[in-house]
Regions:
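Residues within mature, well-folded domains
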Residues: 19-115
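Sec-dependent signal peptide recognition
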Residues: 3-10
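N-terminal hydrophobic targeting signals that begin at the initiator methionine
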Residues: 1-2, 19
Length: 115
């Protein structure tokens, strides 16, 4: 196997493994990350409405892009026909969750709030 082919293969692998986070206008990723520790209700009062209102940006994103934007989900569920759900805790009391449903190929198809 030639050296050029090896480098080309490595380059393709690196480029395919990068997933940029979707750009949601007004979304502050630092506040999202710190909110459950500080209990300021940023997730429930500001971030979740932004994500719901700009759902066209979120829908169609793959699981890795959502994780790049929101971090690891609080809970995950695998449903029938390989559909997957990510659940994100929105407040310190854990009474409100953001649910993102992915289809079998891993694209976000639904985003909603669950009380």
């Amino acid at each position: 196997m030639s050296t050029k082919f090896k480098y080309f293969t490595c380059l393709i692998i690196v480029l395919c493994s990068c997933y940029p986070a979707p750009k949601v206008t007004g979304f502050d990723q630092d506040q999202w990350d710190e909110d459950l520790i500080e209990c300021r209700n940023y997730r429930a009062m500001q971030a979740a409405p932004l994500l719901i209102n700009q759902k066209d940006i979120v829908l169609g994103s793959n699981q890795n892009e959502i994780i790049a934007l929101l971090g690891s989900p609080t809970k995950q569920r695998l449903d029938k026909r390989n559909r997957k759900f990510f659940f994100y805790q929105l407040n310190c009391e854990n009474t409100i969750e953001l649910s993102i449903r992915f289809n079998a190929i891993g694209a976000a198809k639904e985003i909603m709030l669950i009380n």
